[in-house]
């Protein structure tokens, strides 16, 4: 299967249609908006009582929905493209919260001079934390653990010898 970086108009229409069909099957009445096309990012709007159900714990249901949309669209279009599914800007807010958390914990590490391990999180969230602190002169980050228990440890950088 060929990788497509910028989807065609038809690819976008197919993707929106697939997501709308899945939402109808889930009995969720909402609208789907295209936020960007590189990568193709769809945002689900107008969700009322089912928002928590759609997002799931730490975005797990939303990630599963995204995987399902990627698989169906890939099968229909016969090529691969990166599709991101968001709900009421949850992913955007989560990213901002993770950056803020990384900065707060880095300050605690500086104050208490001890490493702090964050909660277990999926790879894309750990990456956000690593990137948020990458330019820090005195802080380092490291992912530890296995599988779903993988977490980021934030520490003071060791002085060069």
For each feature predicted by the language model, list its residue ranges:
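RNA-contacting regions in translation and RNA-metabolism proteins
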Residues: 1-161
